[in-house]
């Protein structure tokens, strides 16, 4: 599907997709500089877990209530999405509102809503029984790399992170941030600390087989949970003194539930992910705090659990409030911290040019003409969405 991409004032830089991307930020970020140096630097680790990962939002709400400032965030999969939004300057309550109001079925759908189709397109929609997109190479049909290409999800993430889109060094976000993905060809963990924030979040969330891989800097990236679902070592490398680790986990099914090949395959994957997480947890110290939301056997693919997951995240964090409060700051310091965090989101970016990606001479001129009057203007997302 052709995508008209509007690139804003500062061109996106290439990401340094190596373990070196997890190195400590060279300077304190703007938000925590206002708090002074006489406090430990706090790192937040958010695990992967699909829909279960929305429990992270409840934890963030409690951290905000307790006035616990975060100096660095490392996240995997849904932890990278929630962590990326928080690092962009959103509060826990704001992320709760965003996620709770999001139409997840629509976000995971590549096709536009039927109500937006022309009459001819609606007829075509009825005529073709197979909705799966097919490719053609060398006279042979090709199946897609994932059931979901993820274009609408990427659009949603880009819209939310647009105010910080010009920031290509994740250390310069309101809170320094790292997202973890897996190189599909090598199986290596890929730590993303620069480049396009939306692409980093989207790559970390790309469950193989479900979402198409994201190509970034010449590498095919999928869900970071395969290589490092609980990126404790990544956060530690960001120069923090104390870690707050939120692990939503992957439940293992009992023998009676292991009834089909896909379920058995998922069980094997869950075992591998849990084992890697246990190795990471073994590196924690007595000063670190671990929060395990009581999610039971809730499915990673059921986004109908979002409200309950957020509530259970809050419950688990409140259960650790005595320890968390030890790292709280007073109200004046917290207000300064919030002001610095939100500053990056105040001014909308400016549109410098319009580029069609992937390029197509057939579509280029009419699409560029549809947007040319917006060049040089502050980006109005409503106007852009209506023209797309």
Where are the language model's segments positioned?
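Patatin-like phospholipase
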Residues: 12-76, 84-388
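Bacterial N-terminal signal peptides
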Residues: 1-10
């Amino acid at each position: 599907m052709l995508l008209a991409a509007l690139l804003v004032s500062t061109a996106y830089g290439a990401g340094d997709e190596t373990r070196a991307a997890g190195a400590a930020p060279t300077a304190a970020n703007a938000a925590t500089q206002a708090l002074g140096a006489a406090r430990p630097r706090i790192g937040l680790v958010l695990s992967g877990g699909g829909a279960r990962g929305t429990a992270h939002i409840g934890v963030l709400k409690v951290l905000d209530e307790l006035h616990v400032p975060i100096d660095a965030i490392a996240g995997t999969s849904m932890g990278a999405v929630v962590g990326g939004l928080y690092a962009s300057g959103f509060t826990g309550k704001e992320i709760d509102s965003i996620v709770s109001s999001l139409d997840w079925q629509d976000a995971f759908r590549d096709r536009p809503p039927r109500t937006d189709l022309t009459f001819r397109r609606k007829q075509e929609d009825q005529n073709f029984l197979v909705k799966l997109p097919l490719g053609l190479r060398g006279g042979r049909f090709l199946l897609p790399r994932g059931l979901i290409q993820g274009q609408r999800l990427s659009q949603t993430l880009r819209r939310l992170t647009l105010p910080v889109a010009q920031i290509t060094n994740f250390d310069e976000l309101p809170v320094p941030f790292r997202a973890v993905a897996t190189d599909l060809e090598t199986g290596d963990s890929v730590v993303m600390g620069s480049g396009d924030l939306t692409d980093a979040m989207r790559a970390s969330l790309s469950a193989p087989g479900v979402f198409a891989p994201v190509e970034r800097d010449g590498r095919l990236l999928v869900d970071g949970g395969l290589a490092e679902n609980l990126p404790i070592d990544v956060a530690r490398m960001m120069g923090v003194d104390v870690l707050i680790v939120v692990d939503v986990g992957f439940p293992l099914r009992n023998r009676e539930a292991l009834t089909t090949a896909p379920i058995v395959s998922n069980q094997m994957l869950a075992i591998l992910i849990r084992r890697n997480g246990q190795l990471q947890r073994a590196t924690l110290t007595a000063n670190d705090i671990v929060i395990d939301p009581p999610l039971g056997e809730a499915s990673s693919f059921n986004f109908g659990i979002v409200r309950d997951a957020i509530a259970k995240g809050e419950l688990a964090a409140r259960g650790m409030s005595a320890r968390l409060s030890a790292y709280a700051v007073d109200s004046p310091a917290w207000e300064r911290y919030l002001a610095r965090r939100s500053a990056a989101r105040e001014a909308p970016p400016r549109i410098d040019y319009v580029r069609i990606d992937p390029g197509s001479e057939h579509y280029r001129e009419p699409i560029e003409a549809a947007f040319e009057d917006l060049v040089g203007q502050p980006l109005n997302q409503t106007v852009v969405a209506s023209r797309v």
